[in-house]
Amino acid sequence: MILKDSLEAKSCFKSSQTSHLAARVAMENPQKGNVINAQSSRQPSSENEFRENLFFKEMRTNGKNEHETSCRSVVLYRNSKSAKRYPLSTKCARISYMQGNKDTKTALTKKYKSNEDVSRMRKKGNKYPQCKSKNLYDSLKLEECIESWSLNQKQNENFYEHTHLNSRDDSNPSSCDRETFFLSDEDSEISLMEGLSSIENGYPDEKETLAALDNVKLSDENAAHLGYLVKYFQNYTDKIILKETLMDWEDKEPSLQELTESTKYLENLADTDHRTSNKPFLFLR
């Protein structure tokens, strides 16, 4: 599916301060090969392809403009054989991607405003959509649920991105209109659609609820907290954000204000990977 060049996916960079950091991490050219990038020969799983096709099919069917959907920005993998585009909501700073080591993946705990904890269970080798209903997980094979189930992306008032699995049959007791679910990737590679979790709620930290950063002010306290999140992310993923991704690409490390407020800075950085002379991503606005 190829979108026309005239596509304008309205971006929310300026209203989501941590989205800049998320996009930088997404652009990182990993040495371990655990993130799908322009040089990767692996293709996204069939589940993700199904999600993408359904997303754009729904967009066309409903006659919605791009800026009226949950797709706030579109990421294009250059040199991809299928020239796929992936919705990436910049309202939700999705940077805590998992290491693709084919080991059992840690459940991510998401904190709802109602103080309801929901875990995203990522199990080794699990290729089925999972739906939580009355503490039971109903696994459905993809090919069996295409006709009877639909996937929708929605956002709640906290700007946490939710993925809902809704049944077209109202009498189906396993209909999930509040619970999140995921589609795992066979190769434990990351999908920008599903694998990138929110910086504000994506870490498996049971001792502390990480604060949402939509309202971060550039105070010393909040700057220190953002630094803590970055350090936590680096320890968790074994990847360096500032040293590896930014300082090697630029003459100087950007200030926190540049990091969180400058859309132009982000787009310039996104345009070219200065270490490889590649242009791995194209951000459409």
Swiss-Prot record:
Residues annotated as transmembrane: none
Keyword Cytoplasm: yes
Gene Ontology CC entries for this record: cytoplasm; cytosol; nucleus
Source domain of life: Eukaryota
Subcellular localization: Cytoplasm; Nucleus
Keywords: Cytoplasm, Meiosis, Nucleus
Biological role stated in the UniProt entry: Has a role in meiosis.
Protein name: Meiotically up-regulated gene 125 protein
Organism for this UniProt entry: Schizosaccharomyces pombe (strain 972 / ATCC 24843) (Fission yeast)
